[in-house]
């Protein structure tokens, strides 16, 4: 059995992990991000029982997105509190899993209107390009920052983002939504497109705060702002995406029940 000294030591270690400095808003966003993602996961998963069968998979994907993010935020929180550094590798592992799943939501919403699997693969390929280029731009940035390196890989990453943005607003996703017989789906896809336009645009702000980034050199915004913008963007986009899908599923289910009543 553990003695009182060992138990006190373990208790102190556990408390040290959970201590959030009062003057550190970034640590606060890591903790709240973890709790918000976990709560959203539980909500989306259990709400599957309230929607028609054809919407259950969409809500499951929403729950997976926030659950994967919650797990990574748990470890990113501890990493940040222990080191004070950006958890770049953990963050990009999270994004590599969750961003393609967000593309899956577009496919599932437009599948009934004739979306083919090729659309899904194109969206996933664009998201992978966006993330791989962004990771190279951050993880392999020379010490002290290199503006040319940051800008080059930022532009490459933006190509993937622009493709997804165009597809959601004017391309295949937008056309399939317009051709669907559901006003709910049309409005839902347009709302998700707004998330891609406005919500995803927060990430480049964080990217440009790292050493060598435009905001770092122009305004003196340091690397500590990278995680602040990323954490805010994750909460808005991942939970927001899920809430839009949830709204579509609930509304469509209620309308279907009203028709059959």
At which residue positions do the language-model features occur?
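Extracellular-loop-to-transmembrane junctions of the mid-late helices
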Residues: 142-170
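Hydrophobic transmembrane alpha-helical segments in integral membrane proteins
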Residues: 10-37
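C-terminal transmembrane-bundle signature of multipass membrane proteins
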Residues: 167-170, 191-261
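Alpha-helical transmembrane segments in multipass membrane proteins, preferentially the mid-helix core
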Residues: 39-43, 104-105, 133, 160-183, ...
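Internal transmembrane alpha-helix with an interfacial aromatic "cap," most often the third helix
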Residues: 41-48, 77, 93-125, 131-139
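Helix-loop junctions on the outward
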Residues: 69-92, 135-142
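Hydrophobic alpha-helical transmembrane segments of multi-pass membrane proteins
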Residues: 36, 58-76, 199-210
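Membrane-interfacial loop-to-transmembrane alpha-helix junctions, especially the N-terminal start
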Residues: 51-63, 115-123, 189-192, 260
